[in-house]
Amino acid sequence: MAAACSLLHPPALHAQTAEQGHLPEIAVKGPRDASIGTADSASEGAAEKASFQSRPKLRPGDIVEAVPGVVATQHSGDGKANQYFLRGFNLDHGTDFAMRVAGMPVNMPTHGHGQGFADLNFLIPELVSGVRYRKGPYFADSGDFSLAGSASLDYVSVLDSPFAEFTLGQNGLRRLLAAGSRTVDDQTWLGAVELEGNDGPWQVPEHLRKTNAVLRYSQGSASRGLSVTAMAYQSRWTSTDQIPQRLVDSGELSRFGSLNPTDGGRTRRLSLSASWFDKGPEGDTELSAYAIDYRFGLFSDFTYFLANPAQGDQFEQTDRRRIYGAQATHRRPNRIGGLDGILSVGAEWRGDRIGEVGLYPSQFRQRLGTVRNDKVSEDQIALHAQQLVELGANVRSYVGLRGTWLGYDVQGREPVYGALNSGRGHQSLLSPKAGLAWTVAPAHELYLNAGQGFHSNDVRGATIRLDPQTGLPAERVPALVKGTGSELGWRFQPDERLSLTVAVWQLQLGSELVYVGDAGTTEPGRASKRHGVESTLRWQIDGRWRVEADLAWSRARFRGASPDGEGNFVDNAVERVAAAGVVWQQGPWMATLRLRYMGPRALDTLDSVRSRPVTLLNFGGTYAVNRQLTLGLQVFNLAGRKGNDIEYFYASCTASEVLSDRCGGGIADRHVHPMEPRSVRLSARWTF
């Protein structure tokens, strides 16, 4: 019954007194660590605090690279969501990888820029208490966008001591973070404020201006408690989008140059969330609710003068919405046919009230017309249940079922096609899950998991009739797209210092039909299949040294017959990812070195053009001068490599190519956004 006891063990959040010469640390115990006797799969886990807090982070979203196999890059300004890669998916800005922060979903359905848009720039990494992750559609409580995986992040509720930290870096980087907490009896208030500015290495300065604040109230004990969290975030920036490789090769444009200095954006996010839990020998109950007010505006230009040789191809995307949601879960021990078990049940609701989601052609940030302007109401309701059973002393299994209902109402406000592309509808599906774990020896455990999951599509694609740019009939997409996956895994864990996992997985999607926010129309895709192998190593060698290593290989192909002129490669699907890190800590010193490799990938369905591999090496270190002052150093791209954060292959046309009549129907080329050159950041933290 070890698994049952672990499932019902209450979380404990407590501060530990920092040793002299060390940074204040928050010790956090999750409700269930992924270990032998408690884990449900080989690919689930919890990132060690020493791992994600010590690693150098160029951007807040880099923290998700603590999830093995995940790569987070950027192809535009630092106020925009990262580009994510995992398990053979180019996840764009979040499709098929679900993220939650403080119990609130981050992914945005029917978003102005792209489905599943997951912007983590409001995150304050220093406050993160834990990163828990899962891979695959194997769990009943995992819903939309979680086909490839999911990650859940939370903030601490208490700090050892208040602190202020100032960071200064190259290219105009400056950042101020102040945070503290106060506890009276069983009630704690925590607050943090972050201010950041950055110009970046770009020829057109980024002029990033970011303001961020967190206020959390918590009270109670380890067995019963309440927390309320308020967050406020806003930023604005000028972005350097991807540029044609041909201009870089000819010397016409710097790697860090821009073809449109008016690209950029702004975003604002206000949220209020609350959670309550009650844990005891008879069961656990958790309730949570949230409300989010969100504003987003983005100006982009990817093809320059291809579609509109006179005024250019810049476009504006907008999103203005309020999000409401709530969820309830209950877990209790039970007996099934004389066998010990745990029954978990839950209910979820999310409602997006989108006042405006729009796409507009623009020039110098001035609108020239309207492609789409819609008001959307979207609700998703889910019920789920999962039964865990101890089949014997060394074998446990679970079966689960998730029922999801999606309802939507699209009201088009574009004067020509808006009414025709309006509509309402709903779709539902059932997603079965199952898993088996066998402890074959005290240090070895095998896992078998299978299940169905889904991701939602932009619901504008479910009501569309006519392409708003051409007036031609457009193909509708299903609101929910089903995927089926399975996984076989092994975990070796002789003690708490060493953990090694291997997972072999496969995932099939019935269709990759998507609504393309950049075009305002739908793009039909084909059924696909992915499979791969992942391995992770976590080894605390002794009190000073810690080593981590991750390897991931995947193969992604479209299924079925290929249309004329196309192949079966899923374009932009990363095939090989490797990461390694070493952390050394002794006395007042701490140092870490982290390496990330992202292998080449097909940039078209024929695999005729491939991206170049990218290797990135980062360094971070701190020195605690005394109990109050800690100095820090971060060096990004330590080796000074000239790789690309992102590569695409498509046709574009520049102004000079239009004037010289060289454009024709566009020039197919790589379009790249370089990773940042070597840069140094210095920080000083004063603990009060």
Residues of each region from the PLM?
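Transmembrane beta-barrel wall of Gram-negative outer-membrane proteins
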Residues: L168-G197, W202-T240, T262-D284, R332-P333, ...
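Extracytoplasmic beta-strand/coil segments of soluble accessory domains associated
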Residues: G61-M108
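Gram-negative outer-membrane beta-barrel transporters
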Residues: H330-R332, A393, L406, S499-L509, ...
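Face-selective signature of the C-terminal outer-membrane beta-barrel domain
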Residues: G225-Y233, G265-P415, A437-T439, P494, ...
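N-terminal periplasmic "start-of-domain" segments of outer-membrane beta-barrel proteins
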Residues: P24-G61, D78-Q83
